[in-house]
Amino acid sequence: KYVQDNWKFKGVVADVSNLDSSNMQFETSGELITVKPDWIINTSCEHMDTNWFKSADNDQLIIMQSNNSSDFDGHINPCKDIEDFRIKYPLEKTHYVGQLVTPAYTRFMQIGYKK
């Protein structure tokens, strides 16, 4: 009821390293919200350590992307290839694994439930 109301969502700006994915608490518009999300979407794994992944429960669908480039500011945790990505973020039940080769880097994506 706090997060979704007729497809209206409250936006939150927070440091992901301070969030516990299995029991998120954050304040928005002066209201403390506690929620366990069904899905976790991280499209920039290369910008952070793996603690966000470790805090997720195995019943939360994880949709994540990373890349293999350390040539950009803030890329502190790139993966060298798709196999490195899968080892760093192991999934028990995988719905999708893929990569997209671009001129600047290769982008990796996984969707599934963690071990």
PLM feature spans:
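S-adenosyl-L-methionine
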Residues: Y2-T43
